Amino acid sequence: MNNKIPILMYHDISDKINTNSIHHKKFFSHINFMTKLGYKSINFSDLKKNIIGKKFIITFDDAYENVAKYALPFLKKNKFKATCFIVTESIGKYNFWDQDHPDFIKKKIMSLNQIKSWISAGLEIGSHTLNHFDLIKLNKKEKKKRNNWSN
């Protein structure tokens, strides 16, 4: 048996295509394609179990509000599992960390209620740091401190 599990990683799901977004219909087609190939989505917590068959993982970085708007209903309706990694200091705010990027587009981050809806749908969340700081610029002690703050 092949123990490799594909991970489909996304940032933003939208009705427009831009630097870190994918159109929601393209996202739906990716997930449906994996299903047609015989794959079933799992969460990271499922990795502790004995995994049988073809599995894949769906992740979303940054917890953009459009993920709750487009992906959540689709995932919930089709009983797919997924994990959203949240920049905890930005809940209900905007993606300030990208503002120096030349293609910057201001995007709203999920609210606490949207995150609760995500969890109540049986989907997982994880930490994507406290404030999206570039961890390469930090020493080991500072990385650990910031990681603890984000949980």
Regions of interest found by a model, annotated:
Residues 29-38, 74-79, 121:
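A short, Lys/Arg-enriched amphipathic alpha-helix followed by its capping loop at the start of a domain
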Residues 5-14, 53-56, 76-151:
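Metal-dependent polysaccharide deacetylase catalytic core of the NodB/CE4 family, i.e.
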Residues 26-29, 70, 149:
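Alpha-helical elements of Rossmann-like donor-binding domains used by nucleotide-donor carbohydrate transfer enzymes
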Residues 15-19:
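Short, solvent-exposed loop/turn elements at domain surfaces
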Residues 30, 71, 111-114:
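Residues within well-ordered alpha-helices
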Residues 42-45, 59, 63-72:
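Extended catalytic core of nucleotide-activated donor transferases of GT-like folds
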Residues 1-12, 24-30:
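N-terminal anchoring/stem segment of glycosyltransferases
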Residues 22-52:
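C-terminal domain-boundary segment and adjacent tail
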